Amino acid sequence: MKDQIIQKLHDVVRASRELVTLSDEAINRLLLDLADQIPNHQTAILEANQRDIERMDSANPMVDRLLLNEARLQAIAADIRNVASLPTPLDAVLEKRTLPNGLELKKVSVPMGVIGIIYEARPNVTFDVFALCLKSGNATVLKGGSDAMYSNIAIVELIHSVLQQHGINPDTLYLLPAEREAAAVMLGAVGYIDMIIPRGSQKLIDFVRDNSRVPVIETGAGIVHTYFDVSGDLELGKQVIFNAKTRRPSVCNALDTLVIHRDRLGDLSYLVEPLQSRQVELFVDDAAYQELHGFYPKALLHQAKPEHFGTEFLSLKMSVKTVANLDEALEHIATYSSRHSEAIIATDAATVATFMKRVDAAVVYANTSTAFTDGAQFGLGAEIGISTQKLHARGPMALREMTTYKWLIVGNGQVRPA
């Protein structure tokens, strides 16, 4: 298997060099055509997706991530059209100067080359990644999870068909075999893959970071907090907490821990009351338990263990932590945060400013839901993931983050003195 994969990676590198010659207009035409063709291939994609769904335990919270339906395919097509409508990130002059010796220097944005993505049960990522990589002039190597194998195969078949219709080398997109051995080859593919982005659980991200010889950008895992301050607006907090927890509980920007000022414990039952309608399980500290006992459904209320405050639930579960003041809230968040998205509900401007300055995360919110951590919501188009590291990219990784740069230098015979 290794030799076959390496040969295919040779082909991908060759295709990436061809992409440099494509105009933005040609790329946009292909992306729009792909979006238009999704409805025509909807039946095949959904049938393949159903095969994947049937292989997964229905109680697994990953089912929602795996699921495709007509509405989600329409949303995917809309995201692809949006990517096509965005300005190209390539050939932008980032910096320019003329040296005293007359040399003209320009720093311009260019493709990374070949970008590898390792991801779990998220077949929509296959579309998103291809659109972003093509728009930014990059070839793509995908290693999807075995849970989404049939869905990914059907999607890649459609993309390859559209590439061929537009006269573009289909090796621009390569879907690795589902076997584990393929991931090991990918992680060691120095000289073939320029950057690898893992999308999925913390376990997956840790594995890729610890085992890859190719540069890695960490994305994904979100242990997300919302702090309800002593000055927090009750109605605003109620709707924000409900949205952040229940809109799509299986995604990385969903709320995991509500941190509440002890002087507002009397309002806790009101803040979490709407969560009952979605059967949200609460894992709460002693102070919160005393407040909620007898109000929140007994079957859904549990006393928290230490591990509940460091868990990305990805389901209808949430922990609650009581703190004495802002400093204690900040300390709790610093201890358990994955540096993804954090929020405060407060009306005191000084408190908000302190929180937003001191919290170390890719995205920090005041008085709104963490569900907005998303490339499309930021006006960036679809994103490859949410980077939780600080080098190269942080937050939603969209088109600009899919490029690097090079220096172009023009002279008229200058030589450097000895």
Swiss-Prot record:
Entries under InterPro entries matching the protein: Ald_DH/histidinol_DH (IPR016161), Ald_DH_C (IPR016163), Ald_DH_N (IPR016162), G-glutamylP_reductase_CS (IPR020593), Glu-5-SA_DH (IPR012134), GPR_dom (IPR000965)
SUPFAM superfamilies recorded: ALDH-like
Enzyme class, first EC level, given as a word: oxidoreductase
EC number per UniProt: 1.2.1.41
Catalytic activity: L-glutamate 5-semialdehyde + phosphate + NADP(+) = L-glutamyl 5-phosphate + NADPH + H(+)
Keyword Heme: no
Secretion signal span: none
CDD domains to which the protein is assigned, alphabetical: ALDH_F18-19_ProA-GPR (cd07079)
Main localization (coarse): cytoplasm
Keywords: Amino-acid biosynthesis, Cytoplasm, NADP, Oxidoreductase, Proline biosynthesis
GO molecular function, one term: glutamate-5-semialdehyde dehydrogenase activity
Protein purpose: Catalyzes the NADPH-dependent reduction of L-glutamate 5-phosphate into L-glutamate 5-semialdehyde and phosphate. The product spontaneously undergoes cyclization to form 1-pyrroline-5-carboxylate.
Protein name: Gamma-glutamyl phosphate reductase
